[in-house]
Amino acid sequence: MDRLRRFPEQGVTDRAALDALLDSQWVGVLSCVVDGRPLAVPMLYARDGDRLLLHGSTGAGALRGVAAGASAVLTVFALDALVVAPTTFESSVNYRSATVRGPLETLDDDERGAALDTFSEVLVPGRTGEVRAPNRKELAATLALSLPIRADGWLLKVADDWPATPEEADAEDDVWSGLVPVRTVLDAPVPAPWAAALPVPPSVQGLTRSDGA
């Protein structure tokens, strides 16, 4: 596992904490160097056990580069709170961030369909049972990659602190300070115009129920 050199106390070595962050987010930034040019592409991902699944068009430059063997790193970030301190200098944010690096494996035809089903089930559990399976043309246009979560290939950083005290910040003690929690919620689904008369399927209902809506 990689190690933090600055603020090492924020480094977390618990694999369960890494999985919790990865499972709580949907978007990461895939970074690599292709033909001497740095690329950073925000994209959806899904954790499947000890690997992360990525997919996109076979025409995507960044994915073609990593599929050809370029080293890559996926960064995932969750903003948990604004830290409002007695001074602007001491104000910050609480967050969790992870990097997972390593070689990406291009999934073959036999694995691609199953991986895409897994990807869909992570994002919208139950949806694959409500729609048709991808056809041969769609699968041929899709590049599916797997990034292993190796013991020596990930880093997790967690900032979870109260603001500095007035004494620590050299500030007056009559200035409010505290935390403003940040969270992502799933609102009520909005049907497409051509589906307005159709019932909301169980998979979509489950998304809002699990979010507390």
Label the model's feature ranges:
Residues 1-54, 64:
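An N-terminal domain-cap segment
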Residues 29, 33, 86, 104-107, ...:
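Short helix-to-loop capping/linker segments positioned immediately adjacent to catalytic or ligand/cofactor-binding
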Residues 44-46, 67, 138, 148:
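Well-ordered beta-strand positions
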Residues 51-53, 73, 155:
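General beta-strand recognition
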Residues 59-118:
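Short, structured beta-strand-loop surface elements
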Residues 111-213:
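C-terminal edge-of-domain segments
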